Amino acid sequence: MMRADGRSSCELRPVHIHPHYMKHAEGSVLIEVGDTKVICTATVEEKVPSFMRGGGKGWITAEYGMLPRATEQRNVREASKGKVSGRTMEIQRLIGRALRSVVDLEQLGERTIWIDCDVIQADGGTRTASITGAYVALVLALAKLVEEGRLEALPIRDFLAATSVGIDPEHGVILDLDYNEDARAKVDMNVVMTGAGQFVEIQGTGEEAVFSRAELDELLEAAQIGIEQLIAVQRRALGEWAARIGEKKEAAEEDTE
């Protein structure tokens, strides 16, 4: 049975990543996953938080936000409330944690990469789209440092992407839930994986329901299918830099000789 938007159970929504979307940021993209659209930027700061000074390692941190009319009903800006919501804080930490998992922070050196993810239109999967887009923005920012001679090689070990999976009352296990599917799902799960197929994070909950080990395995298999396709889109967006993911510093030095 086809889903409401005509997709099969294990089919992603159309995904587009537009690189160099913002003029001033060292790295930036607009990522579109169906009707969900997120602007992701990466900013390089030549210092680290005070607790890391002198340690010889860099840091990656993230901020996440949503425009008031990214949703069907207007949301009040968090700046107007004077505090960041628990949901926003959780997503920010997830994005930063995910990106740090594939970066050699020692090779990055004592600098901070600020990731900003701003949702301009939301239709489910904003946190997973943010991770997938932020990864490309991060690579573009680090590529600029390599081009400028401030880094000898990309300090990135592997690709990284994220997607959602769930169990729908009618369709069973489905990939890449939109807002309406997420609202009715019996089980909702966000999965972050590397290009090598290793898991970075799995966030899964039953909504007034339980799920079996067999269903968990099926959910993770569907997520892996989707993430492999997302990484293919990332590769196209990165162009020649995609081939340099995971390169060693020594190899990069030989290429420049």
From Swiss-Prot:
Keywords in alphabetical order: Nucleotidyltransferase, RNA-binding, rRNA processing, Transferase, tRNA processing, tRNA-binding
Q: What is its EC number?
A: 2.7.7.56
**What catalytic activity is recorded?**
tRNA(n+1) + phosphate = tRNA(n) + a ribonucleoside 5'-diphosphate
One Pfam family named in its UniProt record: RNase_PH_C
- EC class: transferase
Q: Entry's InterPro entries?
A: ExoRNase_PH_dom1, ExoRNase_PH_dom2, ExoRNase_PH_dom2_sf, PNPase/RNase_PH_dom_sf, Ribosomal_Su5_D2-typ_SF, RNase_PH, RNase_PH_bac-type, RNase_PH_CS
**Which Gene Ontology BP terms does the record give?**
rRNA catabolic process; rRNA processing; tRNA processing
Please provide, alphabetically and separated by semicolons, the GO molecular function terms listed in this UniProt record: 3'-5'-RNA exonuclease activity; tRNA binding; tRNA nucleotidyltransferase activity
Superkingdom of origin = Bacteria
Q: Where is the signal peptide?
A: none
Q: Where does phosphate bind?
A: 87, 125-127
Record's function text: Phosphorolytic 3'-5' exoribonuclease that plays an important role in tRNA 3'-end maturation. Removes nucleotide residues following the 3'-CCA terminus of tRNAs; can also add nucleotides to the ends of RNA molecules by using nucleoside diphosphates as substrates, but this may not be physiologically important. Probably plays a role in initiation of 16S rRNA degradation (leading to ribosome degradation) during starvation.
Query: Which family is this sequence assigned to?
Result: Belongs to the RNase PH family.
Matching NCBIfam families, A to Z? RNasePH
Against HAMAP family, the record matches this protein to: RNase_PH
Quaternary state and interactors: Homohexameric ring arranged as a trimer of dimers.
Q: What is this protein called?
A: Ribonuclease PH
